């Protein structure tokens, strides 16, 4: 039999929700998870017995706030000292600690303190998306295209790629979220001629604006702008702060230090925010929120808009910047396309529509699924799919930030300008600053400011062994090379000796080493094995419980009650009670212990019921359904196993 063709999936790894899609038979399928939902919460929870990912993790967040981790995307590729990380830590119930300047999340798992890098948490979400795809496709999934905000910097892109590797995925490409959404928008509009499209992507935690021209399957990004720290979570934070103050005013109690109360309030605020997109008022009803006090209140859409007015208005600045960089007037934009759940907020839509002089906004694509849709198409293209729809599709993306190095006096010398089409390669010649200088120290930065101290340091390396010469004589050739993922490598070569040194930006800025990634891959396998062992344990426990109740139920059957001797009936009943009592006190026993208890019960029941049925049978449980069927059908009920 022919092996199934390998398929690659597209994964939208979101701040609050993630989504996976696959392109096959000429169309994209967005895949539902085991709960039937097409988006999965980007949540991971750790308990005394197991690890939960997705819906199961989010649904128990209020009961287990310290060990339920979310917002990993707001940590990934950042340093612990980053101002945004410090600000976010005030809102997170879980603990974030610093290890070698990198943030790690500290939780309690199976009674032990564990700490995880953001890449590891994200890899657990990616593994969940991988499992969702495998369940649908019925075959292993090894390849994926993963999306990131267009304004993610080099560190954040590489960290996302590492997360994919830890999840056991070959990451074919890291692509920008608004570009993926543009593919979703433009794929079925091929005959429309050249169109300028502005993608306005406001999600749970990040905000991007990209301007593209789309023509006959060529998607060319003209400019991109955004804020990697603006989204629905920030609107939730404003609501939470508002209601904490209201609670303090009304009840003279401060709930801000109680993690569980805050989690319950945040969940209610998120629900209220969604309600306000379709209604002008939302009510919150939270029983016994804090110290026995019930919290019943309401909020109007106008009040919500006023609380977030500065955040909503700030979304227009990147729109103006992207248009300026693309050298386009707003009148030249054919389609303004809304992507991301937060674009459902009426005030955001109104501000954007007014900015474009009343132009109708394009809401034709599903804002929650568009990014995964586009990623799935790009995955098919990279796997060489011959479908006519995607065969000629070409994606030309850009570098979101200028890249350069530090020269004398701390000046930023730019080699690659922002919005340069990628992949790209630029070379420039530099020289020494002093006589007989034995080496040069090359520091690589990204950003738009004139001085390097105001930009983001990506990495540094040294080119040594330069022959002694007066200042200005040696010629050092520096090459910046950005690949299609937007990841940078830098090479420096001394032209007189041919000596070279190269970095694909190193650990200086918080990137995981190859060894660390390999260790995390091994640990991810171990966690997966532990999860499977936990599932088997629960299945064995359920099987034992079901078996006991089957047996007890059979003893109550009128047709059997008089046929079983009283002594035997008491013997079976006593054993059932003994097993139930054991179960009550051994909720966390091993799979083997549950199976042993079940075998003991079967050994007592088998001779009693075999006399009754005229064959070796026990009503109920795994060993009895078939045997009961072999007996005389008129003597008793057929008992099936219930999983």
Curated annotation (Swiss-Prot):
<dbReference type="InterPro" id="IPR029047">
    <property type="entry name" value="HSP70_peptide-bd_sf"/>
</dbReference>
<dbReference type="GO" id="GO:0005524">
    <property type="term" value="F:ATP binding"/>
</dbReference>
<keyword id="KW-0488">Methylation</keyword>
<keyword id="KW-0547">Nucleotide-binding</keyword>
<dbReference type="InterPro" id="IPR043129">
    <property type="entry name" value="ATPase_NBD"/>
</dbReference>
<dbReference type="InterPro" id="IPR029048">
    <property type="entry name" value="HSP70_C_sf"/>
</dbReference>
<feature type="region of interest" description="Substrate-binding domain (SBD)">
    <location>
        <begin position="396"/>
        <end position="511"/>
    </location>
</feature>
<feature type="binding site">
    <location>
        <begin position="270"/>
        <end position="277"/>
    </location>
    <ligand>
        <name>ATP</name>
    </ligand>
</feature>
<dbReference type="InterPro" id="IPR013126">
    <property type="entry name" value="Hsp_70_fam"/>
</dbReference>
<feature type="region of interest" description="Disordered">
    <location>
        <begin position="617"/>
        <end position="643"/>
    </location>
</feature>
<dbReference type="InterPro" id="IPR018181">
    <property type="entry name" value="Heat_shock_70_CS"/>
</dbReference>
<comment type="function">
    <text>Molecular chaperone implicated in a wide variety of cellular processes, including protection of the proteome from stress, folding and transport of newly synthesized polypeptides, activation of proteolysis of misfolded proteins and the formation and dissociation of protein complexes. Plays a pivotal role in the protein quality control system, ensuring the correct folding of proteins, the re-folding of misfolded proteins and controlling the targeting of proteins for subsequent degradation. This is achieved through cycles of ATP binding, ATP hydrolysis and ADP release, mediated by co-chaperones.</text>
</comment>
<keyword id="KW-0346">Stress response</keyword>
<keyword id="KW-0067">ATP-binding</keyword>
<feature type="binding site">
    <location>
        <begin position="341"/>
        <end position="344"/>
    </location>
    <ligand>
        <name>ATP</name>
    </ligand>
</feature>
<feature type="binding site">
    <location>
        <begin position="204"/>
        <end position="206"/>
    </location>
    <ligand>
        <name>ATP</name>
    </ligand>
</feature>
<protein>
    <recommendedName>
        <fullName>Heat shock 70 kDa protein 6</fullName>
    </recommendedName>
</protein>
<feature type="binding site">
    <location>
        <position position="73"/>
    </location>
    <ligand>
        <name>ATP</name>
    </ligand>
</feature>
<feature type="modified residue" description="N6,N6,N6-trimethyllysine; by METTL21A; in vitro">
    <location>
        <position position="563"/>
    </location>
</feature>
<dbReference type="Pfam" id="PF00012">
    <property type="entry name" value="HSP70"/>
</dbReference>
<feature type="binding site">
    <location>
        <begin position="14"/>
        <end position="17"/>
    </location>
    <ligand>
        <name>ATP</name>
    </ligand>
</feature>
<dbReference type="GO" id="GO:0140662">
    <property type="term" value="F:ATP-dependent protein folding chaperone"/>
</dbReference>
<feature type="region of interest" description="Nucleotide-binding domain (NBD)">
    <location>
        <begin position="3"/>
        <end position="388"/>
    </location>
</feature>
<comment type="similarity">
    <text>Belongs to the heat shock protein 70 family.</text>
</comment>
């Amino acid at each position: 039999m022919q092996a199934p063709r390998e398929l690659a999936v597209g994964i939208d790894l979101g701040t609050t929700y993630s989504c996976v899609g696959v392109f096959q038979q000429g169309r994209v399928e967005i895949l539902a998870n085991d709960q039937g939902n097409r988006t999965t919460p980007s949540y991971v929870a750790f308990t005394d017995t197991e690890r939960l990912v997705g819906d199961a993790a989010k649904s128990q967040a209020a009961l287990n706030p310290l060990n339920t981790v979310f917002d990993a995307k707001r940590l990934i590729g950042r340093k612990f000292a980053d101002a945004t990380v410090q600000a976010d830590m005030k809102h997170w119930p879980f603990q974030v600690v610093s290890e070698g300047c990198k943030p790690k999340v500290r939780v309690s798992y199976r009674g032990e303190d564990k700490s995880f890098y953001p890449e590891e948490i994200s890899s657990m979400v990616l593994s969940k998306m991988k499992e969702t795809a495998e369940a649908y496709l019925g075959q292993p999934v090894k390849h994926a295209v993963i999306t990131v905000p267009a304004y993610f910097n080099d560190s954040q892109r590489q960290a996302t790629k590492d997360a994919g590797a830890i999840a056991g995925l070959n990451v074919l490409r890291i692509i920008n979220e608004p570009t993926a959404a543009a593919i979703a928008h433009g794929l079925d509009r091929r005959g429309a001629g050249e169109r300028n499209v502005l993608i306005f992507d406001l999600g749970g935690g990040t905000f991007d604006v990209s301007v593209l021209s789309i023509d006959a399957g060529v998607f060319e990004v003209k400019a991109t702008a955004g804020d990697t720290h603006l989204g629905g979570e920030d609107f939730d934070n404003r609501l939470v702060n508002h209601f904490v103050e209201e609670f303090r005013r009304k009840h003279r109690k401060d709930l801000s230090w109680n993690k569980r109360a805050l989690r319950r309030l945040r969940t209610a605020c998120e629900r209220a925010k969604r309600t306000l997109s379709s209604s002008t008022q939302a009510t919150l009803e939270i029983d016994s929120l804090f110290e026995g006090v019930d919290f019943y209140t309401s909020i109007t859409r106008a009040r919500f808009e006023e609380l977030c007015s500065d955040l909503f208005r700030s979304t227009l600045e990147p729109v103006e910047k992207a248009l300026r960089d693309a050298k386009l007037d707003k009148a030249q934009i054919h389609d303004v396309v809304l992507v991301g759940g937060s674009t459902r907020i009426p005030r955001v839509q109104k501000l954007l529509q007014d900015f474009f002089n009343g132009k109708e906004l394009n809401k034709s694509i599903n804002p929650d699924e568009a990014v995964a849709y586009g990623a799935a198409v790009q995955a098919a293209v990279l796997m060489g799919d011959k479908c006519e729809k995607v065969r000629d599709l070409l994606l030309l993306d850009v570098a979101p930030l200028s890249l350069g190095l530090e020269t004398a006096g701390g000046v930023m010398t730019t080699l690659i300008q922002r919005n340069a089409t990628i992949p790209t390669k630029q070379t420039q010649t530099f020289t020494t600053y002093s006589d007989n200088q034995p080496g040069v120290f090359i520091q690589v930065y990204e950003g738009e400011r004139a001085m390097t101290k105001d930009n983001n340091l990506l990495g540094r390396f040294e080119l040594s062994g330069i022959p002694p010469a007066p200042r200005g004589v040696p010629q050092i050739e520096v090459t910046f090379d950005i690949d299609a993922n937007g990841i940078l490598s830098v090479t420096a070569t001394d032209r007189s000796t041919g000596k070279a040194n190269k970095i694909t930006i190193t650990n200086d800025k918080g990137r995981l080493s190859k060894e660390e990634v390999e260790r995390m891959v091994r640990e991810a396998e171990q966690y997966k094995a532990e999860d499977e062992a936990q599932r088997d344990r629960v299945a064995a426990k359920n099987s034992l419980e079901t078996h006991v109740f089957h047996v007890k139920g059979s003893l109550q059957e009128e047709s059997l009650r008089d046929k079983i001797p009283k002594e035997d009936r008491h013997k079976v009943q006593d054993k059932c009670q003994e097993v139930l009592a054991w179960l009550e006190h051994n909720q966390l026993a091993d799979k083997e212990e549950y199976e042993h208890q079940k075998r003991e019960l079967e050994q007592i029941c088998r001779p009693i019921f075999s006399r009754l049925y005229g064959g070796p049978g026990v009503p109920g449980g795994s060993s009895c359904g078939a045997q009961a069927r072999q007996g005389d059908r008129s003597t008793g009920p057929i008992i099936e196993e219930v999983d």
